[in-house]
Amino acid sequence: MMSMDGDRRIEPLFNTRFTERNADLSPNGRWLAYQSNESGTFEIYVRPFPAINDGRWQLSTGGGTRPVWNRNGRELLYVTLTGTLMSVAVETGSSFTFGGSSRVLDLPLGSLDPGRFYDISPDGARFLVASVEAQQGGAQIHVVGNWLEELKRLVPVN
């Protein structure tokens, strides 16, 4: 985390032996959703922000990644480990409460890259999902034997 005033020094938000990533700040700036593998698999957690040690709630069960807040602040979305987009109703006032998860849609194969590949429209009515077309026959691998000689032939050094 980097403060925008003062010396602008970068400091880790979490200092654990686990992997925490894909953090998303709630629209009101009070809550931080993120994924962590502290349970042995990636799950979705929410903490108060910036006082992250004042509480922690696990929203997903059975695996979760890539949390994204709805702009209205009353819904948190995440992706299961099998590629299903889930929705959790939340209250993000001075305290944090949440309900159960419900299925939104199954994401297309090829959209499950490591980064944030989806978002929700400001009105909450549509989703944008970045995906790639399935390729016939799989990926191609080209092996070049004696590659140094081939490089010298293509790029002669005089």
Residue ranges, per PLM feature:
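Beta-propeller blade-edge and WD-like acidic-aromatic loop motif
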Residues: 1-14, 30-31, 35-58, 72-75, ...
